């Protein structure tokens, strides 16, 4: 991926969850874990877990369009998501 696709629609949606575009970019520019993908409305969608520069743990739903990441939604990881994220990080370090 070569960048991000932002517009008022997705910026306003993630803002309702208290997340900024900068935080999402920090996660993807860091070391995110990719959880799974699924198809909705004929489009492959993905979910990623990651940590911002300030240590905020986020779950991000996104699509890939024209080599760009387009965030659909994002929220603070739930306890369950955090356990999955931590387990994946430990497994990768082995």
Annotate each PLM feature:
Residues 1-94:
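Ribonuclease/tRNase effector modules and their secretory precursors
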């Amino acid at each position: 991926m070569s960048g991000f696709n932002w517009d008022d629609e997705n910026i306003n949606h993630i803002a309702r969850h208290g997340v900024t575009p900068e935080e999402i970019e920090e996660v993807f520019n860091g070391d995110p874990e990719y959880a799974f993908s699924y198809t909705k409305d004929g489009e492959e969608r993905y979910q990623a877990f990651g940590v911002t520069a300030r240590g905020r743990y986020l779950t991000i739903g996104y699509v890939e369009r024209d080599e760009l990441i387009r965030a659909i939604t994002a929220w603070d990881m739930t306890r369950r998501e955090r356990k999955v994220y931590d387990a994946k990080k430990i497994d990768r370090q082995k």
